[in-house]
Amino acid sequence: MLKLDNFYKARYELSKVIRQTEIVQAPVYLKLECLQRTGSFKVRGACYKISQLSDEEKAHGVIACSAGNHAQGVALGATAHGIKSLICLPAGAPISKVEATKGYGADVCLVPGVYDDAYQKAIELRDEKGYTFVHPFDDPNVIAGQGTIGLELIDQVKDMDAVVVPVGGGGLISGVAFALKTLNPHIKVYGVQAAGAASMVQSLHVHKRECLSSVSTIADGICVKEPGELTYEICSKYVDDIVTVSEDEICAAILQLLEKEKVVAEGAGATSVAAVMFNKVPVKGKKVVCIVSGGNIDVTILNRVVERGLAKSGRIAIINVELDDKPGKLVEVASVIAKAGANITNVYHDRNSDSEKVNSCILRVICETRNQEHVAAINNALRE
């Protein structure tokens, strides 16, 4: 059974390990767990869970499964206690997370598939080798560790109206919601999932845990097919609503945090900000906290994310124009775009298009723009 005393005990125990992360005031407050040790909130639950293991459990070594962040938390916690650790990671986990996990002292087993496949492999190895399993979210001590964020928020943000929390398996939001609602039932707790991995949303909709057949999202940290049993029960009781955000919205939020707040967030960590940016949760006129749950994004992925975020916000436009394939037409198009104040970065000619006109081509122009209104103005100018 979860008790608030466990959360205070976890906070005391974790004071030796974790940092109390900063609050940055913006139109909303940002709880920057991306600045936490290992770059994610996951170190809280992992380290507290390991600290509560018996000597016998520690002697067997620990095993965990993870999309990446829990892995680093378990590796750090296990190494700090002198315990051997083995982590099962999805083969598609970002290279940065795989290497960081090894760097904290863990052995790594890469498993084809997604988080749920890594989970099954970890259970098999636990049964075969006798390891102690550290669940990434469906465990009372893990939830208590994550819930210390809720205790920090009560201390840091007075008169808080609502908190927006990324949701994968549900460990973070369960801990935060339990702590906040126990201390102040009037605080609203909203969860956010990627539309391509909305297992908790679906489960709450049908009033029972649902396992999705497939999941896919850039937010690898919350790419989970099925929520936990305990986390589902807590979310059902304490969470006010859970919404979804699209891939483009996540990318736009990552870009917003990077460009405006100078904060590097991974996809999962940016979902809370995306929900506020795109009006998925009712926050107007309220004091709201967005938990930026992690910042472990692979640099190669970040480049793609920035491009998608720029496109979503109208900072990059891809314009297709059908024109006669003759000298001077390209100059005309370029002149219109230049006059509108956009900067052309790439031009592609397609003479093999499906146009009914034989002597025509499709011109694809990629240009830097200011916003969506600017893109619309350029399109109108080209039509004229």
Stretches with model-predicted labels:
Residues 1-384:
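PLP-dependent amino-acid enzyme catalytic core
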